[in-house]
Amino acid sequence: MKRVYFIGIGGIGMSAIARYFHAKGFNVCGYDLTPSPITDQLIKEGIEVHFSDDLNMIPKAFFSPTDSLIVYTPAVPADHSELTYFRSNGYRVVKRAEVLGEITLMERALCVAGTHGKTTTSTLLAHLLKQSHVDCNAFLGGISNNYQSNLLLSDKSDLVVVEADEFDRSFHHLKPFMAIITSADPDHMDIYGTAENYRDSFEHFTSLIQSGGALVLKYGAPVNPRLGSDVSLFTYSSDDQQADYFASDIMIRDGRLFFTWHYPGGQLEGVELGVPVRINVENAVAAMAIAHLNGVTVEELRSGIASFKGSHRRFEKVLDTERVVLIDDYAHHPVELDAAIHSVREIYSGKHIMGIFQPHLYSRTADFYQDFARSLSMLDEVVLLDIYPARELPLPGVTSRLILDLIENPNKTLVSKNDLLDYLHGNEIPDVVLILGAGDIDRLVIPVKQYLQTLC
């Protein structure tokens, strides 16, 4: 195999694998639906990307079934003409998760799964290992602010940190040496159908942990592990002392966050979290546990936690001035919205907070619109955008207005994505603006930031 072609190369997981093959010397190119900051960066790195579902756009060298591997994301529709062509003409066509499983099979994979928190936890775990004497490789589900990439490579470590995605049961292709499960709140009901099926998928994932490995499971998570007899089980919590790993003495002071980390046989006091948000304490406890189990010393943990800068779009402070603060967050599930909004309320107590939310998927909106409305009602002002459909076709009667009508706050409105800047221009800007969503709302972050800067 000499060449790898990606259908959906702009996805966060796909782009990491594309970068991996490019770094290993393969000829790499791909298709995506629209340009994005990720595709812009891939092009800068020398990877050819086009944005039309058109076989004529693919370099001729890739039309060789014996030399070319075709990788696609499940988000691509089944009738995509490029995908259909390759499937019909003898090419090896595989999902992203299958390739990731093969890449990690010969290494010791540290896999982070969960409905929420897996990107921050895996990125933090990778940083703890990377800045220690242990080192690691990593395929991340977000862009690390420490390394400005979603791919980390090492020439000395056989550890690989992997964000284990439950969508389409993708994480069943992995063979973890150790794993973290951060949560198992039902999601992707269009795939799983029931909450029981969703949780069963996580339980099957635990059965894949290799002999001699370990599972670090959030204390109280609704998952019954199916572990081999020689796989260790540990629990963790942000504050419950019944867990094997937990935090205590959590203190936020002058914009800084400190806590004590407890582990079997000891504790580490005065740990400072580089991203001082309370929701990250729990993620830190889990990441520190796996890092410690793999040889990172407690003092290396202390320095690594303090130097962690977070991930793009994970409670990322984009603008911080005396006039206004802009925070960008990937939250797209009600539990994630709750966490983000509670964190903003805690950090900016007494401030007027506006949330701009773009619902993600018609199916998720239909499942959770009441919960979304309940979460958003905690804000002082709510701006709703239209639903981002991603891979889905519209569902009858499912629009953002379902959420809007149930928000218990008169300061609410529904605007189109294209009209958002005009809306902001015409209204009083509050103390804090919180951008929320997993769709293409990220493309509005810079324009919103630029406008807010004119007010300072």
Curated annotation (Swiss-Prot):
Q: Which GO terms describe its cellular component?
A: cytoplasm
Q: Which UniProt keywords apply?
A: ATP-binding, Cell cycle, Cell division, Cell shape, Cell wall biogenesis/degradation, Cytoplasm, Ligase, Nucleotide-binding, Peptidoglycan synthesis
Q: Name one Pfam family in it.
A: Mur_ligase_M
The positions annotated for binding ATP are: 114-120
Superkingdom to which the source organism belongs: Bacteria
> What biological-process terms (Gene Ontology) are attached?
cell division; cell wall organization; peptidoglycan biosynthetic process; regulation of cell shape
The cross-references to NCBIfam families, in alphabetical order and at most eight, read: murC (TIGR01082)
What does the sequence similarity comment in the record state about its family?
Answer: Belongs to the MurCDEF family.
Classification via HAMAP family: MurC (MF_00046)
Its function? Cell wall formation.
Name of the protein in question: UDP-N-acetylmuramate--L-alanine ligase
- Origin species, per record, is Porphyromonas gingivalis (strain ATCC BAA-308 / W83)
